[in-house]
Amino acid sequence: MWDGPYGNWGSRKYLLASLDQSLRRMGLDYVDIFYHHRMDPNTPLEETMGALAQAVRSGKALYVGLSNYDGPTLEKATAILDELHVPFIINQNRYSIFDRTIENNGLKAMAARLHKGIITFSPLAQGLLTNRYLQGIPADSRVHTDGRFLKEKDITPEKIAQINALNDIAQARGQTLAEMALAW
């Protein structure tokens, strides 16, 4: 999606316009889950949740999902969606052996308390938890072409040592590093 005239955060205009554009591109009438992908510091939470509610009420989405929220904001968003009688069912968050943010920002505990599901993205830490980085950064690594999510500066000798130590544990368990990371 492009930023458009309303940014790419959580405004009502942006969310509903992006949903319409996505449905048109996919040739669909609705999506099962319409996610809002990150907390917006510039848009009232009520506006964002109201837009998600409108997407459900208009039949363009069956359920609402949130992504990259912290625990306290998740609690507020859930209360708003409950008040609007909108089915909010799932959180999508980055979570891996290397990224345990949701344990520290209250999201994991709050989701459990509210009986909301969590689905992870990047459980292999952008490929770090595979055999690709055991010897360092491969020549064809995405850090050389698209460093938005995986940055060369973050793949330090210490990180490579951690990857190799985890790989040793995985091998001792009869697993690949990726298998162990996913099982974790």
Whereabouts are the PLM-identified features?
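N-terminal binding-site loop/beta-alpha segment at the start of enzyme catalytic domains
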Residues: 1, 29, 57
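Active-site mouth loops of central-metabolism enzymes
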Residues: 1-16, 37-43
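Short amphipathic alpha-helical segments at helix-loop
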Residues: 3-7, 33, 147-151
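Short, acidic/polar
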Residues: 10-26, 74-78
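Residues in well-ordered alpha-helical elements
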Residues: 13, 29-32, 46, 178
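Active-site groove signature of glycoside hydrolases
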Residues: 23-43
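Beta/alpha (TIM)-barrel catalytic core signal, keyed to glycine-rich beta->alpha loops juxtaposed to Asp/Glu
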Residues: 43-184
